[in-house]
Design a protein with these regions (language model features):
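Helical cap/lid subdomain of alpha/beta-hydrolase-fold lipid enzymes
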Residues: 2-180
């Protein structure tokens, strides 16, 4: 693989799984999961376009157990440099984090139960976001209460109010270029 790929960069990826996936699959009854999945898949399709979403398959692959299984059978490729960036919410207020603010405490509790720690972005524990060389989190002003999963990726332009999205993404691109 190293002859074709020099580096891989990830942002807030659940490399060691997400306790939210464990919780949803553990709490939502199996008979209800197809309906919940269809509803969320429909919403995702409306917001981002496309209809090839499969929440149930995604949740299954993102459990802490299945992530551990994947990691044990899929080692890093030699000669490829791995970099990761992450973020966390420092205060789960519903003003800055209207969608993720409710999930931060749940993910924190699940992260503690799974040995992943309490710090998280609303969906992924900070410890699970780290892979290879961890490059850190974006810089933001003192009044910002951290960056959640949607903000750091600037989904629906949610990050632009809270940090310099373009500079952050440019720094990731510059790091990838300098590690070719």
């Amino acid at each position: 693989m190293a002859t074709k790929v020099s580096s891989i960069t990830s942002l807030n990826s659940p490399h060691n799984g997400s306790p939210i996936a464990d919780i949803v699959l553990g709490v939502v009854p199996s008979w209800l999961l197809p309906y919940v999945s269809a509803t969320i898949n429909g919403l995702v399709g409306i917001v981002w376009g496309g209809s090839q979403n499969n929440l149930n398959a995604s949740l299954n692959s993102l459990t802490t157990t299945n992530a551990a299984s994947f990691n044990s059978t899929t080692p890093n490729a030699s000669g490829v440099k791995y970099f990761s960036y992450g973020s966390k919410v420092t205060l789960p207020d519903l003003i800055q984090h209207p969608l993720m603010g409710v999930l931060v405490p749940v993910t924190g509790i699940g992260g503690m139960a799974k040995g992943q720690g309490i710090e998280n972005d609303g969906l992924v524990p900070l410890s699970s976001q780290k892979w290879g060389t961890y490059k850190g989190t974006p810089s933001y002003s003192f009044w910002v209460t951290g960056l959640d999963h949607l903000e750091v990726s600037n989904t629906l332009s949610l990050g632009e109010k809270w940090f310099d999205v373009r500079s952050f993404w440019l720094s990731m691109a510059q790091n990838a270029k300098s590690n070719q």
